[in-house]
């Protein structure tokens, strides 16, 4: 089964999302006060279609804000050293990722560019291994590396080594100079379980999934969309 164009979707998705928000926004616009009339609504949308996108964004933010607020601390507090960027950030981008996900790898240069450009940004990485046993093995070693203060080194080394498997995971661990860390400890298993629970509650059905401010972005949305979401989160904070 081929991967979709922006991300890998394997878990049941919850109702709603961007399409649902846009549909609701369209209904609200079409059901505008009668004095506008359908012709004026249509002409307004044709003249400035961004109005519909803005309405969808506003509606989506109102719907997700309470849910994200209840998980904010858990989302933005990294496990050990599983983060990059600002020591004292003014905005946090959370990425649910899987080392075996090609779209996560494709998003890597966009995230790295944002980190280089934005000195107030922190990226928190949440292990979300949904693509099989090798993904789970890679995530466990990644969390062990995080506990040893070597997350960045292992993270970058494994992406450079290729798709996770016994050989590439071992090579990345060596490249990161990892000690003989235990990768199946209780705190590692608890972290994986917690990530899956939060992802499910947020409707994160695949990787990558990004969370920033009151936005949940599904798939490899690209540099421009991530930058816009970060700017929006900073403006509304």
Language-model-detected regions and their locations in the chain:
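Extracytoplasmic thiol/disulfide redox context detector
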Residues: 2-133, 184-201, 206, 228, ...
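Cysteine-centric redox/oxidoreductase cores and disulfide-bonded domains
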Residues: 129-207, 211-237
């Amino acid at each position: 089964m081929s991967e979709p164009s922006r991300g890998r979707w394997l878990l049941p998705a919850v109702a709603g999302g961007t399409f649902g928000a846009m549909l609701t926004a369209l209904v609200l616009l079409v059901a505008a006060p009668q004095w506008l009339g359908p012709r004026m609504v249509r002409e307004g949308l044709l003249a400035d279609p961004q109005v519909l996108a803005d309405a969808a964004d506003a509606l989506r933010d109102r719907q997700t804000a309470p849910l994200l607020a209840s998980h904010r601390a858990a989302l933005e507090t990294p496990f050990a050293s599983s983060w990059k960027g600002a020591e004292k950030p003014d905005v946090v981008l959370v990425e649910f990722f899987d080392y075996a996900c090609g779209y996560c790898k494709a998003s890597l240069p966009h995230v790295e560019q944002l980190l280089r450009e934005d000195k107030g940004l922190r990226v928190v990485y949440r292990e979300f291994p949904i693509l099989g046993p090798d993904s789970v093995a890679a995530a466990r070693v990644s969390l062990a590396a995080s506990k040893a203060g070597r997350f960045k080194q292992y993270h970058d080394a494994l992406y450079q080594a290729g798709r996770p498997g016994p050989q590439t995971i071992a090579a990345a661990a060596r490249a990161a100079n990892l000690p003989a860390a235990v990768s199946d400890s209780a705190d590692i298993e608890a972290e994986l379980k917690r990530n899956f629970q939060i992802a499910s509650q947020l409707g994160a059905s695949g990787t990558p999934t990004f969370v920033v401010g009151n936005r949940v972005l599904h798939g490899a949305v690209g540099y421009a969309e991530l930058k816009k979401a970060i700017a929006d989160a900073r403006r509304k904070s």
